[in-house]
Structure formats: structure tokens, C-alpha cells
Amino acid sequence: MKNNIMYYYNIRIDNITQNNNNYYFTINNDNYCFTIYTRDIKESNEIYKLNKYMLSSNILVHEIIPNKDNYVVTIINNIPYILYKIYINKNKKLTINELTYLSNYTYQVDKILTRNNWNILWSNKIDYFEYQINQMGKKYPILVDTFAYFTGLAENAISYVKYTTLETQIETSDNPVISHRKINNTIESLYNPLNIILDHKSRDIAEYIKLSFLNKNTNIYQELDSYFSNNYYSEYGLRLLYARIIYPSFYFDMYEQIIQGLRKESDLLNIVTLLDDYELYLKEMYYYLKKYHNIPEIDWITKK
């Protein structure tokens, strides 16, 4: 891969290290990552435009480097790749302040990068997963045993979003902001241009709240107190936030990793053992959020 990078980007590399689909190298003390491009090819130009806008506005983000022919995506052996320069310590832990920093920025972009029809996206994902389970269920007994519970949670979240759009008004505070497809424990992916989309500001915070449960973050409510003191939420926005907290993205992410052979199926048991605590967490989070707006309750959660 080193020779390919040197050829397509006219750069000299002494050493390169591989971690899964990522190739890391350093030039003049600058760190780079050459990685497989996993987004829709049709999005690549908009991703690059957004990346240039963020850089020109002094918004922290890794910098996409076009190849020698000025293309964003480089095809090697029929596989699309992209190169970007890393601007942060990739091992630094994620904080709620990092999320807030990026969610303060809006951007007028082609709808191709916008992800705001959650109930449709979630419904389509569940339908596809149900098809997979029917085809491969015997191979994954733990997935089969847990699937109905987590799709039930997802259906609750979908209904919550549907009623939110029918019963509440969107305000200017609900405009799409810089958000992320995935949130994890370190901040390298937070500033990865391939991870950036436009969505409601509640998206990233909800994922952080769920991650806080899995990481046993005992300071989450103090962090949220600080967050809400500086970030106004409409009733519409707060209901979206709670819907996304209910939606078990951590389960479906693990589901996909298991199907792709990236994780062991037995890893699911670590989540299953936490279900009672997680239901209590959903209840506590509902009453916490209700301080800001009188959002609807879900009976089976609040009566735990």
C-alpha cells in the first residue's frame, strides 16, 4: 500500500502501519490516515466541500487530501480510499464538551449529507436486519434470542419520533448542525470527515448518553446540567433526544460487527446482563429531561 500512496499522492513515506482498514504514516511530524471510503461515492464531493468549509472557518477537523489528479477518492484494486491529515491526539478520550463544540455549527449543504428522517431510516434498518435473521438465524443463536427485545425498543423509539413530528413545532434551535454517524470513546473519529453528517443536535448527545451508561460514567447528570445551561432545546428537540436515547444503536452496531465477523457473538452477553440497569437508566433519564419540557412518558419504562 505504501507504493500506491506514494504514486497517487506524490509523497514519500518511510514507514507505514496498518490497523484494520486504516494505514497510518507520518511526514514532517504531520500524521496521516489512508482509509477505505465507506460512504456513498455520490457524497464524496459534498463531504469535501464541507471539509473545506470547516477548515476555512477554523473548525477543528481532519483535512482531506485530494490525490495528484485532484480527486477526493482514490480507487485501488476496485476499492475506494481517501487520505486525510490528522489534527488531534487520536487517543484522547471523548467528552461532552467536544460534542458541544461541533454542534454549535450549522452549514447549508446539499440534502445528500442530511440525516433527519430517523423513523424511516430506523424502520428500514430493522426490516433489513429481520430479513438477515430469518436467513442466518441458526448461525447466531444469541442474536436470535436478543433480537426481539431490542427491535421492540427500536419500535418504541420510532413511534416516539412519529408522534413528535405530529404534535410539536420545529424551532430555529432544531436546524441541522454538524453531527456524526458514529460516536465512540476517543475523538479521532469525531473529527474524521467521513464520520460527519448534518443532523439535529440531539443526535450526538443521545449517543454520548448511551455511551456513558456503557462506560459507567457517574458524572453524566452533572455534565448534562452544564450542557443544558448553555444549550436551549425546544419540546420537539427534547423529544427527539429521548427517542434517540431509547433507540438501542449500541446493539445494532454490535449486531453489524458480528455479522461482518469483526466481533464475537458472545460479546452480546455483556449487554444482556445490563438490561435491567439500562431500563432503569431510561426511566431516570426520562424524569431528568422532563425538567425541561413535559415530554410524554412510555408506560412500561416509567413504571419500572
Predicted segments — roles?
Residues 2-29, 66:
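ATP-binding glycine-rich phosphate-binding loop
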Residues 15, 38, 115-178, 222, ...:
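ATP-dependent phospho-/nucleotidyl transfer catalytic cores
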Residues 21-23, 67-72, 167-170:
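Short, solvent-exposed loop/turn elements at beta->coil junctions and helix N-caps
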Residues 26, 159-205:
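Active-site acidic catalytic loop and adjacent metal/ATP-binding pocket
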Residues 30-112:
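ATP-binding pocket architecture of kinase catalytic cores
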Residues 117, 235-243:
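All-alpha amphipathic helical-bundle segments outside canonical DNA-binding/catalytic cores
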Residues 202-234, 245-271:
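Active-site activation/catalytic loop segments of kinase-like enzymes and analogous catalytic loops
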Residues 252-304:
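ATP/Mg2+ or Mg2+-diphosphate-binding catalytic cores
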